[in-house]
A protein has these predicted regions:
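Terminal, low-structured helical/coil segments at or just beyond the last alpha-helical repeat
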Residues: 28, 161-197
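Short helix-capping/linker turns of helical repeat alpha-solenoids
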Residues: 32-37, 45, 50-53, 66-68, ...
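Cleavable N-terminal signal peptides
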Residues: 10-11, 21
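Hydrophobic face of amphipathic alpha-helices that form TPR/SEL1-like repeat modules
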Residues: 25-32, 44-48, 59-66, 95-102, ...
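Bacterial N-terminal signal peptides that target proteins for export
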Residues: 1-9
């Protein structure tokens, strides 16, 4: 029994220590990235990402998309964004949507872009909310719908995306007072449901 307990305690300390090491490695990678020491950041992010760390996967996606410390490679960016997006990282979902919208690393597919923007927007990502507004306003991947465009621009603006407010005001000029009221109602309901004022 004593051996079993010692083994379990050792195992517990190993997991606690390794979790701490992974957290330290991630923070070291973030710090290196902020210093623009991309080669070090990449070396630290890669093993974490390969072990399934969604934040590290997202970070590698950014590095490949922007060519930071690695040659710019949109296919590789999509791979890492997708892995993080599938784990629920809102920024990964938004950036994966952006890749589909632009056709970078994947064939252009507006419907797929809308899918990922929506998942991210529902989590409160202001850029995704704005991007979803653009898709509705332009009728890309969805039927053109100024009410929905206004709704998502309004929500994005309330979450700090200045372009959301600007585009809301532009699209408003194409809408009737009843449509504007409906869009405002939908935005208000979404914000109340998601704990926003």
């Amino acid at each position: 029994m004593k051996t079993k307990l010692t083994f379990l305690l050792s195992l517990t300390f190993l997991f606690l220590f390794s979790g701490s090491v992974f957290a330290d490695d991630f923070q070291d990678a973030v710090d290196a990235y902020k210093r623009k020491d991309y080669k070090t950041a990449y070396k630290l992010f890669l093993p974490l990402a390969e072990q399934g760390d969604a934040d590290a996967q997202y970070s590698l996606g950014l590095m490949y998309a922007n060519g930071e410390g690695v040659p710019q490679d949109y296919k590789e960016a999509v791979k890492w964004f997708r892995l993080s997006a599938e784990q629920g990282i809102a920024e990964g979902q938004n950036n994966l949507g952006l890749m589909y919208s632009k056709g970078q690393g994947v064939p252009q597919d507006y419907k797929e872009a809308v899918k990922w923007y929506r998942l991210s927007a529902e989590q409160g990502d202001a850029q995704a909310q704005y991007n979803l507004g653009v898709m509705y306003g332009d009728g890309k991947g969805v039927l053109q719908n100024f009410i929905q465009a206004h709704r998502w621009y309004n929500i994005a603006g309330a979450n700090g995306e200045d372009l959301g407010r600007k585009n809301r005001d532009i699209v408003e000029k194409k809408m009737s007072p009843a449509q504007i009221a409906e869009a405002q109602k939908l935005a208000r309901e979404w914000m109340e449901e998601h704990g926003k004022e």
